[in-house]
Amino acid sequence: MKKNILLLVLVLILSIGIVGCTSEVKKETSSQPLKTLTIGVMPDLDSLPFIIAEHNGYFKEEGIQVKIEHFKSASDRDTALQAGKIHGAISDMLSVVFFNDNKFEVKITSKTEGSFKLISGKDSNISKIEQSVGKTIGISKNTIIEYLTDRIVESSKIDVNLVKKVAIPKIPTRLEMLNNGKIDMATLPEPLASTAISAGGKVLSSSDKLGINPGVMIFTKDAVESKSEEIKSLYRAYNKAIKFLKEEKPESYIDFVIKEAGFPESVRNTLTVPNYSDASMPTEKELTEVLNWLKTKKLTTNNYILKDISNSSFIK
C-alpha cells in the first residue's frame, strides 16, 4: 500500500514538472520577437492611424516593430514596393490592378479612410465645377487622384476631356503650384486640401460628397505568406489607434503628427479628423467601378474579383 502511494506521488511530481517545462517552452516560443514590417505612407489622413500607433507604442505592445517610410508621390512609393524596400503600403485599387497586371502580386488587406478634395485656387475665379472647362487641374496621372478627379468632374455632367489635366506627381509641389496660381485647380488629399483652403482656395467637391474611396492597404505576396503574424499584429495596433483617435482631441497629438508626417505647420489649425472605423475590407462594387474606369482609359483589359486580389484574414 505504501509503495503504491509513493508511486502515485512520484507520478504526480513528474507530471507537474512536465507541465511546467511545457509551459516554459510555450512561453519562450510566444515571446520570440516578431520580424520587422516596413510600410510606405503618403502625406494624407490614411496614414494617421499608423503614425499614432507608432508614436503611442501600440506596435510595441503587440510585439512588432514597424518602420514607416514617407513618400511624396505614388510612383516613388510603388517603386519602393517593387524593389523590396517596403513590405506594404497605403495605396489604392488602381495600383493593385497595375501591379497584378504586371505579374507583381500584391494583396489588399483592408481599406483605408482618407479624404480628397478638388480645390480651386484663390485667384482662379472658379467657384463651381461647371466653370472648370478649359482650366488646368493638377493631378498625378493614372492614380487615385486622377480617378477621383474624373469622377468629381463627371458628377457635374462635364466631359472630363474639356479640362486640362497637368501631371504633378509630388503632392506638396501640387499644393504649392495651386497656392501660387500656376494652376487653376488641384485634387489634393486631406490635410493638404484644408491647407489650400486656408490659403484662399475653394472646395468644388470631394470624395466624401460622392461617397467614393478606393484607398486600400496592400502587402506583397511574399509579405502575406511570410509575415502573416506580423500583419495581424499591425492591425491590432491599428485598431487601438482608431480607438485613441475617436476618444482624443487633435490638440493632444497634432504636434507629433506634423513632425512625423511632414505636414505643413498650417495643418495645426485646419486638421479635420475622419470618422475612422476599425479595419475592414473594401467592397466588390468599389473594385468594379475602378476597373470600369481603367478599361475606359484602356489601362487594363483584365477582370478581377475582390477575393482573388485580397486577403481579409488579418483583420478577423
Positions of PLM-derived features:
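Bacterial lipoprotein signal-peptidase II cleavage site
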Residues: I18-S31
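Short, glycine-/small- and polar/acidic-enriched structural segments
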Residues: E28-N161, K165-I168, M177, D184-E190, ...
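Short, solvent-exposed loop/beta-turn-alpha elements that line the ligand-binding surface or hinge
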Residues: E61, G134, L210, Y276-E284, ...
